[in-house]
Amino acid sequence: GAVGNDSYGKTVLDSIKDFNIDKTHIRTENGDTASNRTYLTPDGDRYYKDDSWNGGVFSSFALSASDRELLHSSDMVHTTFSGPNFNDVIDCCREKRFPLSVDFDICRDFDTIEKYLDCISLLFISGDEPTLEKAKQLSSKYPNTIFIVTLGENGSTAFSKGTAYHCAAAEVSEVTDTTGCGDSYQAGFIASYLADGNIETAMSKGSQTAAQTLSFIGGFRY
């Protein structure tokens, strides 16, 4: 990825400096760091306005040859459908297969989604009842893809080869800010699933990780 050479970019890099994260593929570019101005309701639900998103240097981010080599050797690659390099990641995966996880957020264009399912291992989508039914159908058609539908306070449901797994949302005493809950769920799920390949355990870990994020302002504590 890339950050800008502004104060936000420095904050991002400072926030992860003490973690065991390989930072060699984070570029610092001339310009603004991507940002998304977030607003909260009195109940802690986050929302955005039309002008919230500023893509900054991330808008023109492109994979380098070194980045592509990293993808090819990764245990799991996670990306977003809305990211500027999504199609490049898909091309890389089709060129030389690697486990791929994709966040489709609130996308409901299942005809488009289906075009990529040949190389997606984990598919995350924020859903509702119609989404659950569609995910179940697709999971029978694409047995190599696990479909995980997050349902907010109603927990999450995953489908693998037509079989459904449900996990209740972890209980929290108070909701401070929902920003980053979906990302946290995905991180917890992926880490757990890579460890033992158990879908139900991964869902539980995702739920617990999301619940922790609900307790503070922002997507991660820094």
Language-model regions: role of each:
Residues 15-18, 23-27, 40-166, 197:
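Ribokinase/PfkB-type carbohydrate-kinase core domain
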Residues 8, 73, 92, 119, ...:
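Residues within well-formed alpha-helices
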Residues 1-35, 205:
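Substrate-binding N-lobe of the ribokinase-like
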Residues 9, 34, 86, 186-187:
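A general structural signal for well-ordered alpha-helical segments in protein cores
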Residues 2-3, 80, 201:
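Residue-level marker of alpha-helix boundaries and capping positions
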Residues 136-222:
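Conserved phosphate-binding/catalytic region of the ribokinase-like
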